[in-house]
């Protein structure tokens, strides 16, 4: 499964969840709560197999974070080999990706936009430019927008919007200085994800 580059709204309709985690996409899903295409409203009448349910759950989570199959499986295998609850550890590893942290801090409006900002060199980690979206953020790391990028229209708009939203509890954010700190790992109850990670564990354990 490669990284999806088409319409995030259309893919969200197909998966049945708001993959962009934006109000705009959610409003669209509320109006059209069925898969795209001429047969979208008639889908889902047959009972899916256990395999297809688990495959779909894996695809939903991978697409939510914008991770390709190789990266996704590598992270899962890492999570399965460290102490702790595998599903929670797996989600924490996904949350620690730099592109995701940039999104959580509100510097970008979507994870896709966050990947672009990181790749184009607009993001600093502890004062140093990092252009790798999969870079793993550590507890205590300070993430900021490069000074020369703070005047960009998109980033200005994103930070104004973030001031009206609740900041994730594992993050400290100073919108006025375009700076945030990753203060702790998120607990499972912190993550309001419409995902059953146990299905993903079962998928890879088959």
UniProtKB/Swiss-Prot annotation:
Gene3D superfamilies: Ribosomal Protein S4 Delta 41, Chain A, domain 1 (1.10.1050.10), RNA-binding S4 domain (3.10.290.10). Residues 96-171 form the S4 RNA-binding domain. Residues 28-52 are annotated as: Disordered. InterPro entries: Ribosomal_uS4, Ribosomal_uS4_bac-type, Ribosomal_uS4_CS, Ribosomal_uS4_N, S4_RNA-bd, S4_RNA-bd_sf. Coiled coil: none annotated. Pfam families: Ribosomal_S4, S4. Keywords: Ribonucleoprotein, Ribosomal protein, RNA-binding, rRNA-binding. GO terms for molecular function: rRNA binding; structural constituent of ribosome. GO terms for cellular component: small ribosomal subunit. GO terms for biological process: ribosomal small subunit biogenesis; translation. Part of the 30S ribosomal subunit. Contacts protein S5. The interaction surface between S4 and S5 is involved in control of translational fidelity. Belongs to the universal ribosomal protein uS4 family. One of the primary rRNA binding proteins, it binds directly to 16S rRNA where it nucleates assembly of the body of the 30S subunit. With S5 and S12 plays an important role in translational accuracy. This is Small ribosomal subunit protein uS4. It comes from Deinococcus geothermalis (strain DSM 11300 / CIP 105573 / AG-3a). The lineage of its organism: Bacteria, Thermotogati, Deinococcota, Deinococci, Deinococcales.
């Amino acid at each position: 499964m490669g990284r999806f580059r088409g319409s995030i709204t259309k893919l969200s309709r197909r998966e049945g969840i708001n993959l962009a985690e934006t109000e705009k996409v959610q409003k669209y899903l509320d109006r059209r709560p069925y898969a795209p295409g001429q047969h979208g409203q008639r889908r889902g009448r047959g009972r899916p197999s256990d395999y297809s349910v688990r495959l779909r759950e894996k695809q939903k989570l991978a697409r939510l974070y914008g991770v390709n199959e190789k990266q996704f499986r590598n992270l899962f295998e890492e999570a399965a080999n460290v102490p702790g609850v595998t599903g929670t550890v797996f989600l924490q590893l996904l949350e620690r990706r730099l592109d995701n942290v940039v999104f959580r801090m509100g510097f970008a409006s979507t994870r896709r936009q966050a990947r672009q900002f990181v790749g184009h060199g607009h993001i600093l980690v502890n004062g140093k430019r990092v252009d790798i979206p999969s870079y793993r953020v550590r507890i205590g790391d300070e993430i900021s927008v490069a000074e020369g990028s703070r005047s960009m229209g998109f980033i200005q708009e994103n930070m104004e919007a973030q001031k009206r939203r609740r900041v994730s509890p594992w993050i400290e954010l100073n919108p006025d200085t375009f700076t945030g700190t990753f203060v702790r790992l998120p607990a499972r109850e912190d993550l309001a994800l419409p995902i059953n990670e146990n299905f993903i564990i079962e998928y890879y354990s088959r």
